[in-house]
From Swiss-Prot:
Family to which the UniProt record says this protein belongs: Belongs to the AP endonuclease 2 family.
Binding sites annotated in the UniProt record for Zn(2+) 3: H181, D226, H228
Class of enzymatic activity (EC top level): hydrolase
Keywords attached to this entry: DNA damage, DNA repair, Endonuclease, Hydrolase, Metal-binding, Nuclease, Zinc
Name of this chain's protein: Probable endonuclease 4
Gene that this polypeptide is encoded by: nfo
Lineage: Bacteria, Bacillati, Bacillota, Bacilli, Bacillales
Superkingdom of origin: Bacteria
Originating organism: Staphylococcus saprophyticus subsp. saprophyticus (strain ATCC 15305 / DSM 20229 / NCIMB 8711 / NCTC 7292 / S-41)
Binding site for Zn(2+) 2: E144, D178, H213, E258
Cofactor: Zn(2+)
InterPro entries in the record: AP_endonuc_2, AP_endonuc_F2_Zn_BS, Xyl_isomerase-like_sf, Xyl_isomerase-like_TIM-brl
Length: 296
């Protein structure tokens, strides 16, 4: 089972450190940002320590790296041309880094239309993706299902389908299915996940799903908030998320936890991933999990 989490990539070790952290958490896959998600400062490819990273991965049975594009990319912006242009250029360079890292998919938030309306946002995203997907490689852009917070585009399956249909090289587009976002967007992930998946299949096709983000939600269905919660401690609940993780449809697909670190002290929060992954492998909810995470 391909199950992992977001891990850090920084310092001199870069990918080597990411692979070590993923192994420490008992993971078989992992997701990284190539640098800080809120800025465009990036190390050159030759400083990402890729060879060492792959050696660690091979030694510990890790595979299927997933890359996440930074939040600052907004190719749905029709108001500020420089924001759109920066997004296109930076996404192109992130795809080069993704390919160098040996990853197949780079997850992208489709963007926000900043008040100009969904149609304008979708049109701009299509324009941007058509510019980006001319480079000759096999990296896919995995459009993420969004919660519908603010002016986010991709808040329902129909919006993602419109983007995919408008892109010329859409064989290079996949989908990252986020359980928290989809729940927050109003889909019944908790009680009828197969129904949600069937709807997705009719509108987009489940074969497009190449990454799953496994997150509980701090808010009730349809809240359009996007606030992740630890597995089993939110409104989706353990049973539903355990069902998603062990679903046949996602057997060969990386399932990535992006659940929050635990603890009141901001400087001393603990990563939940090792124990959450163990719990999902055992398929039994541990209501004392947060205390155990704090005691790590």
């Amino acid at each position: 089972m391909l199950l992992g989490s977001h891990v850090s990539m920084n310092g001199k070790k870069m990918l080597e450190g990411s692979a070590e952290e993923a192994h420490k958490f008992g993971e078989s896959t992992f997701m990284i940002y190539t640098g800080a998600p809120q800025n465009t400062r990036r190390k050159p490819i030759e400083e990402l320590n890729i060879e060492k990273g792959h050696e660690i991965m091979k030694a510990h049975g890790l595979s299927n790296i997933v890359v996440h594009a930074p939040y600052i990319i907004n190719i749905a912006n029709t108001v500020k041309p420089h924001v759109f242009e920066l997004g296109v250029e930076f996404l192109q360079s992130e795809i080069e880094r993704t390919q160098a890292l040996g990853a197949q998919d780079i997850v992208l938030h489709p963007g926000s239309h900043v008040g100009e309306g969904t149609d304008a946002g979708i049109k701009k995203i299509i324009e941007g993706l058509n510019e980006v997907l001319t480079n000759d490689n096999n990296v896919r852009i995995a459009l993420e299902t969004m919660a519908g917070k603010g002016s986010e585009v991709g808040r329902n399956f129909e919006e993602l389908a419109r983007i995919i249909d408008g892109v010329n090289h859409n064989d290079r587009l996949s989908v990252c299915f986020d359980t928290c976002h989809t729940h927050d967007a109003g889909y019944n992930v908790k009680e009828d996940f197969d129904g949600v998946l069937n709807e997705f299949d009719k509108i987009i096709g489940v074969d497009r799903i190449k990454v799953v983000h496994v997150n509980d939600s701090k808010n009730d269905i349809g809240a359009h908030k996007d606030r992740h919660e630890n597995i089993g401690f939110g409104y989706i609940g353990f049973d539903a998320l355990n069902y998603v993780v062990h679903h046949d449809t996602f057997k060969d697909i990386p399932k990535i936890l992006e659940t929050p670190y635990v603890g009141e002290d901001k400087k001393n929060k603990k990563p939940p991933y090792k124990l959450e992954i163990e719990m999902l492998k055992q398929q039994k909810f541990d209501e004392d999990l947060k205390n155990k995470i704090l005691q790590q």
